[in-house]
């Protein structure tokens, strides 16, 4: 009961926030920012609140945002707030307010009002100080959540604009150190793990850096993030994706203040990135930077910039070629000329410029300006002098480039001229003809044309080609000059004046701009028509027939053509606005036929004004836009009527009129290009108001299909079109479910002429395939029936391509269940007709069975039936039978018909039967998943399958039938209930299985792989076999098959299918136990071989037996199932018992079992090596190995593996020893047989260590020795000692392998524990080598931590058990190594091992040896830096702690020398005598430790022993250096007075008398201080602090003595004259106040007061102010005792009331207030 109550009380105390410990409460209350703890402990909350509220009010005056906290944290009620009384929710709210206040006040932490306000938070709300920086960094490195909290705090402050340099500097430093530490911690030698670690690190700190880099208002945090990103790039293995992301984010967020450091960061990131162009975002940002190249040149003096410059230049070139950004050209030129790039990079960039020059086209450079600029740059760069010019010229030679040719190619006027000359068919003039001759030739041509009269009404008629070609040739020659074009336009043959009534003029130009002619000619044609339509005689005409051709021009690839077409449409739009009536070309536009389906005025206006004109600008930009516009206008616009403001909704009638209008022109125009381009839009319109495109365009398809092959070739060649493209466009006019269209398509397919045009045939079938998903069910059925009939009825010689396409169509489209049923049902009639003949004829032919079979085989009808059946069944199999389970009854019927047919023709028809069976098998999952699908059990499907199995000789058919039976057994057991067991009985008998196996063996095939499907059928049927028959049935099966070959396969397939469940483990274990031990071990070996086969690049047997898709996940899943079974099989108690019995017999059979055991062990070890990277599988191998090792006793195990240890394969021998190591771990220490066997094996292990040359093998042997010795070593010390000698010798510890050395040292450390004094003979060899290796481990850039730790472990064991063996010379070397180790900044584990060892040494080694070694080692420690010195002092302190007073007193000489050297450290460091620099902060920490260690020594000395040391110290500090070394003396005194401050502060009144030794020195320092020297000024402060401590703790009247008081007091008062150079309030005033309190004499007070009052009339305001503040402090501290001299003070006080300095005057008033408070009366009357 009492214990229960105590436990409850302990739990309550642990969870309680209330403490009843008065000392603890007082200590908590005394924590203050402002006051000493002893002062703070006596303060009330009201006093603290009053002072803190004053500071809060001042903060509110500085920043109004603080006012909000006046009602919460600084309210009157806050004095009553007590965290102990608050609940968790209230404390959380309070924490949130405190955190918010600290965010805001953070930037003002150095202001006194802020300190006062925070004082209230600390005292009232217990908001304590933060942990030291080193702890923060260490925790942030190891705990990412802390780093995240610090980062979020900093980012929140920055978002709220509450940041300040201290916060940003703190975050940047911690983040940088933490990132560096995390990179070191996550470093791995394996690439995959390293990549994963880098990914994790980026996930942890990447988002923080990403946000920090874009805080443009906080440049400091951006620069800090640049530093951290640089560390990540330099030390982390970041890929290019991450580096590019950081670079993009950097340029996204930089500004004018951060672009320079950002550019440096970019350079560093680029150097760690692959040499490729930077992203477009970076290029876009850098192109805006002023003086980019000069800045890069400046940066290149300190950092490599070549990769950034290279990537930037390539990105600029890409922008130039794709976007025409010529701003980047000067930057590219400057980068190439600035010597920032290597020769290879210069070549690549220049060649890229050449390529860009050729890529720039009219879309990027319409006026040729960009090409001219590029050409100028290329030429100027090629003429550059120096090395850069040489490299560029060599690049030009490599690409065989001609600068003059480039000038020509980049000229703006060259390309159009060349295009005209190359495109004209009549350009027959010689290449060297002069321009004058060309002009004369063109003039004569015009004269000839003037006599020519048009022979046709329109150039769009069928008979206009000759005249059009002649005129077109002249046009192409005249298009280059406007004057020539004017002459051409006016020739009589064109009939320009008659253009409104005669369509020849306009139709000529229409045909030109729609034809395959140069861009300039098309533009000229469009311009001519535009100018003509602007004339007055065109105002009363309706030129709607031109609109389709304008739409064609709007889809031209050339932008100039589209622009000219847009201008022409705009003119047409202006004509439409007029009241026009007469339609141009209405009668003769196409010769005898006029323009079809003319539009009325409103429809025309809607087409032009609402459809075409609003989209002209977009159509000019994109050639496909006009197609989309027409489709959008013609389609039903319910949802798009308001999408574009410039277009209005078109009515059904309007859209139908436009649709018919365009279709009419498509049908009538002779130009294929016009047809094709307009069909792009029309073929996207299904129908309008019931009128489909097929209705209107079917004549076009018939016309095109009626053309002969030669005519098609001629037409397409004339217009430079692809025949297949035209075929497809024309055929696409057919829509799904259109009866006439489909009928036309079917007629064309059946037409023999169509077969001569394969492209057209292919287009028709492609169209049917495309329409198939949109067809109705009956249409699909009729189409499929038609296609199927084609494949069966047409002649392959005449319609070969058609039949091929029909077959492909049926294979590609998704055949519905009804279609497939129709096809299958047609087979039954076909087979019936083919096999049944009239009775008399059948009797006449079938005289014998053989003759009947021959007759049927020669029957063409039967052959056709077989072909048809084959095709149908292939279609069914390819149509995913799983989705058509309704076919199952028909397929079973077909299978039955095939059996009947096979008996007639004398062939098994195995292929056809296999098709049916595979389709049926695919349907089984559907019947299993869908309960609505049922199989009729009365039909006899099982009998059919049994027939397949029993009568077929095809293995494929038998296997498929067995699989189907197994599936039916799971899905519909009733179907095969009567048939499945006869099948098993039949297959299990000796009539089939043995012959089958023999056949496979004779053919040299793998019998297991060949019978895989057979085995699978039995495994599948396992769950349907009665439980009482399962064991016997499968035992019989395995015995018939042969257990040595098939038992492992059965087991593997069982566990693969049903997993290693409890039932399956029990069943398989029973099966295994039914066979001999030899068979069981062989089976286990083969199981392991099968599992190993899974992981081969090309699995063989495992892929056959276990399947799998080859993926990593699937492979691991399959292997896991197998390895889950293996440990259970090995754990079989019966197997272990039988093996144990055999081992006791020790005969030949036992030897065979040992061999199999060794092979099994080898297989497990090999497999474990294979799956080492897969944790789950590796663990399963470990379980199996554990169970295998337990099968034999350790003695038998060693006998079994002896053969393996004799193998030449060193890797195998090493694995065997590792297995032995595992077995040793599991052995009991109490088993004598195991102990004897293992100790007897030690000599063999030492022999391995001596004789083997393989280091890994030696390493494993040493590990085994370590394990055996640790467990059994104390039972046979001689054997262990022999092993220790071997390990310490040259064969092991003396080897060059680092890992072996590490293991040897660790093993020796264990052997020291076992042997203790018995290992002494080995140590003269082992200790020097250990120290040598320790020294080697610290040499080089990367210290060897493992060797380092092992050496320290060995030495630590020696120090713990036999410390007397560590002599002075060994200790000197060890301490020197420890200094180097401390300076090397190793990981935590290494540092812990080192300090652990040194702690043992400090505690256990003889003190004289230890202190002498430390004395001799000081120089080494100080030369290694702060870390080594700090650790040195820690060890010294521990050595002082652990040894007695007598030991310390005996070695005081060595210790005093150590402390004198230590106190001289500051001087040696500052003067540069130290080899390693130590920062001032580190020096401060070291001197604090020196003081602490000195106190530890002092505590163990008496006064008689220590006083001479103290005297010597002061003498050494004051006179130990030459007189001319003033700075050295100052630094030495600095350290000494730092110690004295600690000395007097800790020992207090005990050592007051020691102050007599420092008076002279202190007076000298105070009298001679040069305040311009920072060191002397700081020493001055230390002296005052030390004196203050002496005065404060004087309890013996030491300073009342006139000699002591008189020596110090005048000098102290004289220091007020230095108030202008130093702050008197910090140290001087407290010291003087303490002196006055210690003096405690009226005479001394009068002397002090008189001297101080004299300084009140000093001319310096700072002196007067300091004295007034000193008087205030004296008044407060001494009260009336000091105010006895008030009469002397009053005149001075009165004078100070009118002082020239306001501050002095204000402080004087405060002094008066203090006096009045002490006296209790006013001074006004006295001062008057």
Curated annotation (Swiss-Prot):
Domain of life: Eukaryota
UniProt feature coiled coil, ranges: none
Gene3D superfamilies, A to Z: Leucine-rich Repeat Variant
Example GO BP: positive regulation of transcription by RNA polymerase I
Keywords noted in UniProt: Nucleus, Repeat, Ribonucleoprotein, Ribosome biogenesis, rRNA processing
Ranges of the HEAT repeats in the UniProt entry: 540-578, 881-926, 986-1024, 1191-1229, 1235-1274, 1622-1662, 1683-1721
GO annotation, cellular component aspect: 90S preribosome; small-subunit processome; t-UTP complex
GO MF term set: snoRNA binding
Cited Pfam families: BP28CT, HEAT_HEATR1, U3snoRNP10
Compartments where found: Nucleus, Nucleolus
Function, in words: Involved in nucleolar processing of pre-18S ribosomal RNA. Involved in ribosome biosynthesis.
Subunit comment: Component of the ribosomal small subunit (SSU) processome.
Record-stated family: Belongs to the HEATR1/UTP10 family.
Identification of the protein by name: U3 small nucleolar RNA-associated protein 10
Annotated source species: Chaetomium globosum (strain ATCC 6205 / CBS 148.51 / DSM 1962 / NBRC 6347 / NRRL 1970) (Soil fungus)
Species lineage: Eukaryota, Fungi, Dikarya, Ascomycota, Pezizomycotina
